[in-house]
Every structure is written in C-alpha cells, then in structure tokens.
Amino acid sequence: MLSTQFQPCDARRAFPCFDEPALKASFELSIEIPDDQTALCNTPEKETTPSSRPGGSAGWKWKVVQFEKSLVMSTYLYTWAVGDFGYVEAETERRYSGRRLPVRVYTTKGLEEQGRYALEHAWKIIDLLSEVRTSSQPPQDHDADHLQAVPNRMLFSSCCT
C-alpha cells in the first residue's frame, strides 16, 4: 500500500504548493496505477480509463484514475492511497437529496470483515452529524458518495471533511 500523510507540512514533498494551514486550495488528482490496484482519494472517483503506458517485460496493464475536484482545503488535508484494497459497504438510513448515501470502509484485500465494526458506526455518525446540522444534505457536499477508511489512515470524502 502507498498512502500519503501530509501533516504537518509534507504536501510540498508531493507537489508544488504553499504548504501553510491558512492557505487553502481545491485539488484535482489523476493518478496512473497498475490495473489490479485501487486508488482512493478525499473525493469521489470521476472516471477510470486505460493507460497508454507500455506494460514492460512483466506485461502489466495500467489505468488512469481521475478524481472529482475537492472542496477548498488546506494542503495537508488532501490525501490519496493506492493498494490492493477490498471494502464493506452500507448505506445511511437517512436520505440525502432523495437517496441513501453509500458508505464504504476499505481494508487490505481479504480483511474486509475487520472493517465491519467501523462501517456499522460510520453511517450512523454521518446521519447524526446531518441531524445536528439540521440539514437534509450530508456535511459539506450533497454529491459526495462515500466515506473511505484504510488501515492506519482515514480518508474522509467531502461529505465528512
């Protein structure tokens, strides 16, 4: 697994930026990864296309994963991960813009059931936060589609940022 941890000021090691908490920006990520891997980000996946990269002697196939534009945030909050992930999924009980919000907990492939406890609470927390805010929209963005959790790191989609 490859993942980012930009706190307190390491975003500048990954991409050119003003890496100060008071300076904020929105981000768009495209990442090229082996076809059998999964890429995760703070924002929902926009599209996946085959890569033109040659497979080399190993014959690997590659893909390009593009993610939606993020909300305005500090650089240290932006994060992504690439790995051999599996997930468990549920939906919120509450409806947002007429639909239930899918919630996913990602784990190392084969360990999905170990994410079940987190999943059972994640959708409840999303609904609770929306009740506290007295809104029919999930926090921040009604287009957000899932909460993602990976080992030792939490990646919050824009619905939880």
Where are these regions (language model features)?
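Hydrophobic helix-coil surface modules that form long, contiguous segments used
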Residues: 3-11, 16-161
